[in-house]
Each structure stands twice: as C-alpha cells, then as structure tokens.
A protein has these predicted regions:
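Long lumenal/extracellular ectodomains of secretory and single-pass membrane proteins
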Residues: 1-268, 278-448
C-alpha cells in the first residue's frame, strides 16, 4: 500500500480491507458518497467558492441532467454560493429558502425576484412557494407580509394551474395527460386509472402512447421511480420510453442482507442492474448476483431452486405480471447470507479474451474479509493479459463511508440511481476523467 492508503485504511462491517476516501479530490469523493452524505449533511466536506464547485453543486441537485439529490444539492449550492437563478435552474424555487434567512437584504432580493416571476406567470414558481397549509406556515406569513398581502391575497397570488390543483379542484377535464410532468404522471397514475372522471380518457391516452400517437413525459423519471411504482403503473410502457444507453458491461448485484436497509439499497441495485442488463452489448439480459454463491441470472427466467411445486406456482403467478415485474422478480435469488465479492472476482478471472469493458458493481461495499485480495489478484491478472476491463464502483451505502479501493487502477466511482450518467463514459477514462466529462456535459445541457 502507498502511504496515503495506509493512513486511510479501515475495515468493512465484514472485516475486509477498505478505505475512508477514494481520492484526494473532494468532488470525486462526494460523487461516490452521495447516498451517505444525503443522510449525513453535517459531514459534507467544505467546498471553496469556485466556478467548478458551483457547477458540481448544481449537478448534484439537478433531477433532469444530474443526480437529483435534493438535500445534499441544497447544502452544496448554499456552500458554494450558487446564484438565485442558477439555484432555481438546477432545482426548485423553494431551494432558495434553504440558504436565505428572513430580515436580510439577500432575502428581500430573493422575494423581489420571485414576485416578478409570479407576475410574469411562472407556474413553477407558484407551485413551490411556501403555503399557509404546509409546514412552512411561518415562512409563508413572512413572505406575505413583505409583499403587503393577507392570507387570502397571498393564496390567490400563488395559486397555480398544476395537475395537483386540477385534481383537488375536480377540474378533471382540464387535465391533458400528454402535458403532465413525468413525476406527477407516476404519482397520480393510480388516481387517473381509477377515478370515473379520468379512467376512460387515461386508458385511451396510454393506448395512444403505445401506438406512438401521443407522448409520455419521462424527462425526470429514473429507473428507480419505475421500480418503486411497478405495481401502480404500466411499468413496461414507462420503461420503454426512458432513454436507453448501451455499453459493454456486466451488472453485478449485491443481494446480501445488509442491502435490505432503510435506504432500499437492494431495490436501487435491482432497478439499476435490470436497466444495465437490458442495455448491455456484452451479455444482454444477464445479471451476476453475489452473496455467498455468485449466480448468473437471465432476466425473466423463473428460478427453479426451490423445487417443482414452487416453480409451478411461480410460473402461474408470473403470467399475471408485466414483463418488467417478471424480470425484476427473476433477480431475487434468496441468497443473502454473505457479501463475498471475492468469489465473483475469482470466477471472472477465468474469462477468456472476450472481456467486457466494465464490471458494474452495485453494492453497499461492505465486502467479506478477503474480497479485496481476490479483487487485487484478478485486476493484476487482467493487466498481465492486456485486458482493459475496469470496475465501476456503484455505491449504495447510506450508513458508512466505505470505499473499496483508492484511485489506484483507474476505476470509476459513482452513486445514486441514475444510470443515464454512464453514457458519458469513454474508453480510457478513470474516475477523474469521468467526473470532468460529467461536468462538461452538464454545463452544455443547462446552457452554461
């Protein structure tokens, strides 16, 4: 180990060698640890006020072109002093109240800006303004007082024409489904499909979407959104409409017991692993699972390990489900006793010359003792044989800071649940190059 590695070494919950950080670059560390810092905001590293750090903060917050981490993004944008208009561009209007305090000049400037936007008819500003009926009652009173309005005047001024308001006002005929934002469409799909006033129109709309006659907005829909709501929506339709990226990779999903946590790490791993398997050019529809015994899973293929009776019952139940649900169910192995990543690496070391470009490891990184040694041996074997295969460490751990290796082999570090970011990978990239390209592409996307 290097001197830096020695002083940053630690053990996983299961006794394997790991580290406290991935790199000396704080942005790369945050990129890998967003799940943890989202739950531990008081531990977020301080970032100095610079253009690159401001752009990174916006990227972390942005649900359309970035990672969509609201609380962490707010903290970073406040820390790096992102401008008001850029704060709103990356997130929501109420993000500005996270950093501004009443009775200050900057707070007054924010309210003047928001007032002018509402006068212009900005519906999104209206939607995210604090309301008397919410937990932000005191803030709403402060704003109304500054604008010289009483409760009724303020409520009328910020009343918006969103899907939520149309539903609450029973203006069902005003809802144009092709204009409903992506997350609202998922949130209210059950209501649309069951309310007598909308059911017939909604089902006709879905048929039109399938026929290519109408659009379904999915700009901020993630694979995890589809996974969470797979029993409430037409998961096959939503999955078919999200952007697909292709890559030479093998998704490797951790199915150990520690993944079944309050952060739903297992659910996120399944959602991302399923997406990557569908998009893999190396082994389409294949996923490697690992716990005590690695398994190669074919999406949608029933698991027969529990005997004839279970197989027959599972097959009958599968007929009632969508293709998406069947493929997700096929990833449940029942093996959750260990986190033996070393067993996976030992098996993969026997691959012939036809190698994938990436091994995408979806895990909380709490590997069993000895896994690091097996990984080191396999990476050394890859290098000796001239293989350029790299590991994408996809961290889902919200409990601990656990890094499987420091930036030694040029591997990639990422977290969250947006696999679309992998489209910015390129041959020869290491973690730093990937991060830099993410920020370059994000700047283009938002017009910076």
């Amino acid at each position: 180990m290097t001197l830096n590695e020695i002083f940053n070494a630690k053990l996983t919950e299961n006794g394997d060698l790991s580290f406290k950080k991935a790199s000396d670059n704080p942005l790369l560390n945050i990129l890998f640890l967003t799940e943890y810092y989202q739950k531990h905001l008081d531990e977020v590293p301080l970032l100095e006020d610079s253009d690159i750090n401001r752009l990174f903060a916006m990227f972390i917050r942005d649900p359309r072109y970035g990672m969509g981490r609201r609380d962490l993004g707010r903290r970073l944008m406040s820390m790096t002093d992102v401008a008001i208009d850029d704060t709103i561009k990356a997130g929501r209007v109420d993000d500005v109240f996270y950093r501004e305090y009443p009775d200050t000049y900057s707070f007054a400037c924010v309210l003047d800006y928001l007032h002018s936007e509402i006068v212009k008819g900005n519906e999104l500003v209206k939607k995210w303004m604090p309301r008397y009926s919410s937990k932000n009652l005191l803030l709403a009173r402060t704003i109304a007082k500054y604008w010289g309005m009483n409760k009724q005047q303020y409520g009328h001024f910020i009343k918006c024409n969103t899907t939520e308001n149309k539903l609450s006002d029973h203006r069902f005929d005003d809802i144009q489904f092709e204009h409903v934002p992506s997350l609202a469409m998922i949130k209210y799909a059950h209501a649309f499909s069951t309310k007598p006033e909308t059911k017939e129109r909604y089902l006709k709309y879905l048929e039109d979407v399938k026929a290519g006659k109408k659009d379904l907005k999915v700009s901020t829909t993630t694979v995890y959104d589809i996974y969470k709501n797979r029993d409430k929506i037409d998961a096959d339709l939503f999955f078919s409409k999200i952007e697909k990226i292709s890559g030479s990779w093998i998704p490797i999903v951790d199915t150990s017991g520690s993944m079944c946590d309050s952060n739903d790490s297992f659910g996120k791993a399944l959602a991302i692993g399923h997406y990557l398997a569908k998009c893999s050019t190396y082994c389409p529809n294949k996923v490697v699972s690992f716990s005590s015994h690695p398994q190669l899973i074919t999406l949608g293929q029933p698991v027969q390990r529990r005997g004839y009776w279970y197989y027959q019952q599972a097959s009958k139940e599968a007929l009632k489900k969508s293709q998406y649900q069947r493929e997700i169910d096929s990833m449940y192995t029942g093996d959750c006793s260990n986190t033996d990543f070393g067993a996976v690496m030992r098996l993969l070391s026997h691959l012939d010359g036809n190698m994938p470009e990436y091994l995408v490891v979806l895990s909380d990184m709490e590997f069993d003792s000895g896994s690091n040694t097996s990984k080191e041996e396999t990476m050394r074997l890859f290098k000796e044989n001239g293989y350029n295969t790299k590991i994408i460490w996809w961290n889902l751990n919200s409990r601990n800071i656990t890094v499987p290796e420091m930036d030694h082999y040029g591997n990639i570090y990422i977290s969250g649940y947006n696999p679309m970011l992998l489209k910015y990978l390129a041959a020869g990239f290491d973690g730093e190059a990937f991060l830099n390209n993410l920020l370059r592409e994000y700047a283009k996307a938002i017009g910076e």
